[in-house]
């Protein structure tokens, strides 16, 4: 616990009040959502096998048929037979699994991991799940055997050339990751996505079904393509629209049955209303705010049942597509701000019960703390370029300040004309201390997307998805998860001539020579460039194969029904190249700050100042600085990224240039944009576990730097210098770049009071002016994190910002907890 003179964030203060047994006035006035929250909060999520079992049963019966038809029929089978639930106190219904927190299985993706996962998941350090003995038997005896030899992961594993395979996997079956050039496509069928929810609210699935039926009627009966490709696609759209309508109607019947048996008149009326709403939406257009929320939730949840899309389907621009319904209901007196907020918070607790499940060990390690990226996007601009904030925008921010839940993720779009009131509310919400909202910059993203082929209207209407990504519904298309590349490993291979201490004499990289014989910085730099490009080569070969393999394994009829280009061309979203679409792919840079600082130290101390020899550096690294602490301190004192120091920042810019130039040269061969991105999720922790000590003074097997953030403790010139280094390290002359995740940690004292709010608003303006992609904040005292480590039960509800999402601190592994504690804590701006 902090000293009484140490300012606490409101989140910390609420937690201390709870520990002290003080009454929570907000809880008292929001009994409904807290009753739901209490039913599952703090409990380990359970694996629910119904979706996997029903999906598998259907796929067994449809072999030989077009994949898109098989998928639609499988979803119809799921809709008919999956158990439907309505939680006590809930006003919004539709879930994909058992009561409480749950995760579902997608055996079509990575079913070859199932046997291993059933044993591993309950005992994992990162994001464990439970499973009943009966469900485990179903998985082992009924689900897994069918998918052996049929999964996407197995196909990919066999397709990779041997030189790429050895950088990707550490075993022939591809069950163990090497954490060097890591493919991520096998634990999600695509990267993050945002549906066009507005289409559902305005037209309903009956309207989408009728569109498909009209297209079927217009097909040329003699055309080979119309018969072989278009007809199965359109028939699948009809089937899947019927499926989600059926699923909603089953909820309507359940609500009506529950209402008939209910003795409490208030709850009886609520259930009757729910029955009426579920019988209307999502089949038909929504008529009011309540129906709009329910229709969106049905769409979102059925999409999650349909496929493992990215790291959960995001919610899009909720303050825009819900706004007409909210405004009309407010004006006509049907709802109040508080009743609307209650509906949204019922949705939030529904989101918090569905937990994204990664059955592969790598997937679990990459997405710690039950990672979730169902981003709700607020603010920004309209397609016409006007400021988009409205009353709902502020309602979402208010909910984040009042309701202590780590769901949903909240992303606030910022632009140069964002209103002062909006920035003030955003700053106050950040100051609350639970990590919301993350900030996304229109001034970087809109022109960048226009340069990649979007119209201004499309780019201005982007929605945040995943960790820091942005999607343009109806224009960009599905892309498989890209490679995560451990460039700190590339640096290590320069030091050990193509080898790594973790993997012994295995020659994984190029033999670039004995670094102790390099006489100039240019020789060392050129060796690094060769290793760097060797990794990029492997990543692009991976992606080329992935693009060809994916369409053989996945279809998404419901997602396709919601995409204009898919319907126009009668092509599934998983089609590698959809006419008029923009395919926004990426590869991930791991250890950016680690590599920059290491190269700066070698250049400065070895080749320029000659204070150390390369031999002395390597000897210190091999013994992990034990007995060589003086060398470690010298290395740490070299210029570092994150301080607005051109010496280090120029190296960062050159490293970035290697990647963007490679992407520009070879992306056209992939038929997509394959751009450099700096968004590690939590993978900088497992990637660090294979990298020995590095020349920036980092100890062996410890986490790498995360995203485009500075190395822990290296950024000593304040947070504005961090922004300036981030700006200086980018190659703005290239469009071949994507998201950059940036973490900043403030003490509550730094942003205390009205003055602190104004300083934070000014900081946000600077972020916007520098055209940086993303920034997110932790506002917390280090002592609170240490206290939570020592007494996790008391701090069960402590929420922190991790990697584009917020999570309960106690749900993180000790390694990730320590990584968060070690982040530089800024106490002044």
Curated annotation (Swiss-Prot):
This is Isethionate sulfite-lyase. It comes from the Bacteria. Pathway: Organosulfur degradation; alkanesulfonate degradation. Residues 706-829 form the Glycine radical domain. Keywords: Lyase, Organic radical, Pyruvate. One of its GO terms (cellular component) is cytosol. PANTHER family: DEHYDRATASE YBIW-RELATED, FORMATE ACETYLTRANSFERASE 3-RELATED. Homodimer.
């Amino acid at each position: 616990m902090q000293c009484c003179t140490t300012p606490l964030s409101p989140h910390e203060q609420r937690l201390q009040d709870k520990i002290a047994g003080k009454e929570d006035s907000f809880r008292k006035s929001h009994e409904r959502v807290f009753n739901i929250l209490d039913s599952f909060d703090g409990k380990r999520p359970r694996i629910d096998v119904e979706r996997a079992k029903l999906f598998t049963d259907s796929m067994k019966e449809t072999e030989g048929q077009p994949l898109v038809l098989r998928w639609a029929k499988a979803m119809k089978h799921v809709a008919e037979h999956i158990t439907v639930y309505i939680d006590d106190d809930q006003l919004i219904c539709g879930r994909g699994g058992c009561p409480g927190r749950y995760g579902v299985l997608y055996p079509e993706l990575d079913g070859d991991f199932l046997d291993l996962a059933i044993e591993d998941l309950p005992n994992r350090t990162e994001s464990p799940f439970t499973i009943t003995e009966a469900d485990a038997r179903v998985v082992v005896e009924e689900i897994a055997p069918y998918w052996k030899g049929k999964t996407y992961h197995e196909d990919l594993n066999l397709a990779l050339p041997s030189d790429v395979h050895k950088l990707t996997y550490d075993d022939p079956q591809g069950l163990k990751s090497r954490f060097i050039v890591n493919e991520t496509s096998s634990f999600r069928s695509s990267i993050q996505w945002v549906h066009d929810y507005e289409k559902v609210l305005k037209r309903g699935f009956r309207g989408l079904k009728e569109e498909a039926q009209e297209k079927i009627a217009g097909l040329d009966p003699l055309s080979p393509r119309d018969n072989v490709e278009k007809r199965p696609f359109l028939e699948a759209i009809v089937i899947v629209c019927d499926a989600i309508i059926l699923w909603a109607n089953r909820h309507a019947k359940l609500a009506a049955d529950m209402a008939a048996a209910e003795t409490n008149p208030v709850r009886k009326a609520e259930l009757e209303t729910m029955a009426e709403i579920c019988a209307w939406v999502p089949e038909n257009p929504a008529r009011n705010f309540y129906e709009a929320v329910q229709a969106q939730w049905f769409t979102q949840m059925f999409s999650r049942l349909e496929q493992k899309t990215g790291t959960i389907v995001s919610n899009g621009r909720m303050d825009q597509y819900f706004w007409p319904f909210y405004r009309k209901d407010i004006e006509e007196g049907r709802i109040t701000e508080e009743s609307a907020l209650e509906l949204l918070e019922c949705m939030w607790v529904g989101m918090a019960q569905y937990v994204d499940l990664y059955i592969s060990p790598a997937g679990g390690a990459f997405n710690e703390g039950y990672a979730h990226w169902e981003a709700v996007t607020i603010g920004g601009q309209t397609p016409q370029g006007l400021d988009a904030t409205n009353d709902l925008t502020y309602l979402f921010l208010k909910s984040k300040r009042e309701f202590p839940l780590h769901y949903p993720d909240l992303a606030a779009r910022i632009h140069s004309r964002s209103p002062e009131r909006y920035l003030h509310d955003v700053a106050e919400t950040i100051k609350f201390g639970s990590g919301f909202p993350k900030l996304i910059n229109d001034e970087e993203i809109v022109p960048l997307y226009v340069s990649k082929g979007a119209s201004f209207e499309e780019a201005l209407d982007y929605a945040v998805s995943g960790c820091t990504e942005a999607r343009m519904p109806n224009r960009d298309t599905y892309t498989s998860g890209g490679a995560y590349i451990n460039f700190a490993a590339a640096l290590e291979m320069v030091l050990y001539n193509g080898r790594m201490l973790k993997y012994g004499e295995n020659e994984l990289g190029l033999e670039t020579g004995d670094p102790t014989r390099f006489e100039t910085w240019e020789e060392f730099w050129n060796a690094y460039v060769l290793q760097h490009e060797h990794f990029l080569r492997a990543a692009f070969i991976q992606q080329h194969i992935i693009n060809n393999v994916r369409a053989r394994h996945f279809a998404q009829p419901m997602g396709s029904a919601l995409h204009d280009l898919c319907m126009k061309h009668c092509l599934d979203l998983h089609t590698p190249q959809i006419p008029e679409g923009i395919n926004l792919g990426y590869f991930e840079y791991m250890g950016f700050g680690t590599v920059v600082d290491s190269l700066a130290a070698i250049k400065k101390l070895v080749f320029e100042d000659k204070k150390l020899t390369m031999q002395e550096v390597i000897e210190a690294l091999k013994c992990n600085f034990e007995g060589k602490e003086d060398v470690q301190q010298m290395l740490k004192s070299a210029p570092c990224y994150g301080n607005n120091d051109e010496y280090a920042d120029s190296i960062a810019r050159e490293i970035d240039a290697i990647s963007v130039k490679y992407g520009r040269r070879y992306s056209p061969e992939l038929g997509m944009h394959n751009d450099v991105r700096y968004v590690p999720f939590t993978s900088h922790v497992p990637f660090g576990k294979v990298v020995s000590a590095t020349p920036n003074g980092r100890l062996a097997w410890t986490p790498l730097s995360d995203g485009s953030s500075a190395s822990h403790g290296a950024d000593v010139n304040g947070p504005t210098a961090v922004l300036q280094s981030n700006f200086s390290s980018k190659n703005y002359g290239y469009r071949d770049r994507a998201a950059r995740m940036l973490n900043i940690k403030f003490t509550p004292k730094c942003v205390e009071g009205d003055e602190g709010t104004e300083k934070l608003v000014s900081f946000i303006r600077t972020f916007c002016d520098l055209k940086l992609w993303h920034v997110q904040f932790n506002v917390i005292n280090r002592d609170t994190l240490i206290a939570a480590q020592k007494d996790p039960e008391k701090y069960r509800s402590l929420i922190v910002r991790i990697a584009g999402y917020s999570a309960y601190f106690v749900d993180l592994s000790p390694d990730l907890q320590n990584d968060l504690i070690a982040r530089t804590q800024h106490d002044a701006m």
